[in-house]
Structures are given as C-alpha cells and as structure tokens.
Amino acid sequence: MLNKLFLISAVVLVTGLSACAQKQDKKVVMQSQGTEQIIPKKKMNWNPLTPEEERVIVNKGTEYPGTGKYEHTTDKGTYTCKRCNAALYRSESKFDARCGWPAFDDEIKGAVKRIPDADGSRTEIVCANCGAHLGHVFLGEGFTNKDTRHCVNSISMNFVPDKK
C-alpha cells in the first residue's frame, strides 16, 4: 500500500514538473507601458545585443547626448534597426538639430511605429518590425519644412552606406 502511494505521488510530481517546463511554442507577448505586442517566434531571430544596447533597445533607455556615433554622420545611406536589420531612415531625411542625437524629419514608409507615452507628454518611436525602442518624435519645432523631428538613439541603429 505504501509503495502504491509512493508511486502515485512520484508520477503526479513528475507529470506536474514536466508540464511546468514546457515552452511556449508559437508566440511571445512583449509588454510595453500597458500595451501588448504579440510577435511570432520565427521573427525573433534577432541580432545579439550588448548590455548597453539592450538597456536602450529593450528597456527603453536613452544614450547620453553627444555620445552616439551617428550624430554627425553625413554619408549617404540607410539607417537600419540594430536588432532586426529593418531599414528605418534614409540619410536624405537626416538633419542637424543640435540636440545631441541623430535627427530625421521622415522615416521609410511603414518602418517606424509611434506610441504615445503613458503620461501623454511625448511619443515614443519603435521599429515597426521588431518593436525595438528608437527614441521619440517631436512635432511643431520648425527645424525642417516637414516640422517633424525623430530624435533617435545611435545605439538603436546601424548605418549601411550607399554603394558608390
């Protein structure tokens, strides 16, 4: 009788533990300030990030002003998402806003998603493909004719120069 009880307990324990260890096989839910974004796992074949890149791209941090490698870049080319390589901005839309970060007055169509911050004071911009934090967008400042400034962390992007 004691052996039967022990055997039944062991089976229940092993079954329960193996059920807890099963992985989610289809989708992962990313949460960001009250919103949920469901991303199929097949799209999660992203580039590895350094701890500092992860602090900005995943945890929505900000690099220190004036420290980004693309702030003063004037070469012709395309700025891509550091995490998934999606094209985000063309160099023709980049301008010097003297704000300490690269500034663009337009994105590649459909490449950037705008998400109002929880307090409504700013609008976050993220990669439309993978949800990577890029920075913030500001309207009505008068820097360019488009009256839009995408203030982007250099650390969130790579630069691919045009072929000469």
Predicted features by range, described:
Residues 12-13:
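Repetitive helical segments and hydrophobic/amphipathic motifs
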Residues 1-7:
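Bacterial N-terminal signal peptides that target proteins for export
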Residues 16-19:
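C-terminal motif of bacterial Sec signal peptides marking the signal peptidase cleavage site
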Residues 37-80, 86-164:
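A short Gly-Trp-Pro
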Residues 21-41:
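Sec-dependent signal peptide cleavage junction
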